[in-house]
């Protein structure tokens, strides 16, 4: 696990859900996606992460909406007009690497909740269970991004790797599609087409009592989605020696999606987070904190102040 040592040794990472649904701090959202993406302050954003002590970033490229923050030849072929002109992911990767930080890209593996137009374009609705056409088209998208970004991206965090019968929130709950939809070797081949060393995790949803892999033979670290601080590496059996990783939201529930306004304050005290981080680090676990971000690319001030305090404290330990 030499290639993942940066995750094991770093104090923590930061995840943000910056998508077409993200709301501003005040006023109404900017309706033009290209204008939003063009306005994202990459250098200032990277400086903020460096200042608070984060060692990696997980950033969304498409999530709960049909807008993507980087151009993609396959998307343009099947679903034109939904990619930004600016390659925000490539610019983030470059800015982070210049500061010694790493970039992991969030990417969804199903589009059940997306617009009908998007589902038709990629063949999602052709059959309630058989997702072969969708998988072929979606792997073209993944491969195109992987080859486009190359070594600017250090990892993938793939979401929605689950059985539809287990998730009542799905539009097609009970339809019967599940992880058998993946041609596993081809999927991971597409993910690593541009960078054979890229790290990969597959997320099956919020864990109940332990984090696990979906395809242990192919994954490098645990996706680790959690809604609280209860799951820790000390009481979690590692699966096939994969890097333990916990991902917890700190303020708004995964994203500032509901309405314009100030993002909620941190829900944990400094001592609670230090206790969690301390135990995870003692067992060589990695931790990512999801924090709120506004439409203009600025981060929740109270949460960032808390992370900055944590970063200073961890340096003294």
Can you describe what each PLM-predicted range is?
Residues 1-317:
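Mature catalytic domains of secreted/periplasmic carbohydrate-active enzymes
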């Amino acid at each position: 696990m030499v290639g993942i040592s940066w995750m094991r040794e770093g104090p923590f990472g930061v995840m943000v859900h910056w998508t077409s649904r993200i709301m501003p701090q005040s006023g109404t959202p900017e309706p033009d996606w290209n204008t939003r993406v063009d306005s994202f302050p990459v250098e200032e954003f990277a400086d903020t992460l460096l200042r608070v002590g984060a060692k990696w970033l997980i950033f969304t490229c498409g999530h709960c909406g049909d807008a993507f923050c980087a151009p993609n030849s396959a998307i343009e072929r099947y679903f034109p007009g939904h990619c930004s002109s600016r390659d925000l992911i490539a610019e983030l990767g470059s800015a982070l690497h210049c500061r010694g930080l790493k970039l992991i890209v969030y990417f969804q593996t199903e589009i059940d909740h997306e617009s009908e137009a998007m589902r038709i374009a990629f063949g999602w609705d052709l059959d309630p269970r058989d997702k072969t056409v969708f998988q072929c088209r979606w792997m073209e998208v993944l491969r195109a991004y992987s080859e486009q970004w190359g070594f600017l991206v250090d990892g993938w965090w793939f979401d929605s790797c689950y059985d539809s019968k287990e998730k009542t929130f799905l539009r097609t709950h009970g339809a019967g599609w599940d992880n058998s939809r993946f041609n596993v070797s081809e999927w991971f081949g597409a993910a690593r087409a541009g960078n054979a060393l890229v790290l990969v995790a597959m997320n099956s949803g919020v864990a109940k009592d332990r984090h696990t892999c979906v395809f242990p033979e192919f994954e490098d670290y645990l996706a680790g989605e959690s809604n609280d601080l209860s799951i820790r590496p000390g009481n979690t059996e590692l699966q096939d020696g994969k890097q333990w990783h916990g991902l917890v939201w700190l303020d708004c529930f995964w994203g500032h999606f509901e309405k314009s306004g100030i993002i909620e304050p941190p829900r944990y005290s400094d001592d609670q987070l230090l206790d969690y981080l301390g135990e995870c680090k003692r067992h060589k676990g990695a931790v990512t904190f999801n924090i709120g971000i506004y439409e203009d690319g600025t981060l929740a001030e109270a949460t960032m102040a808390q992370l900055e305090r944590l970063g200073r404290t961890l340096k003294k330990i």
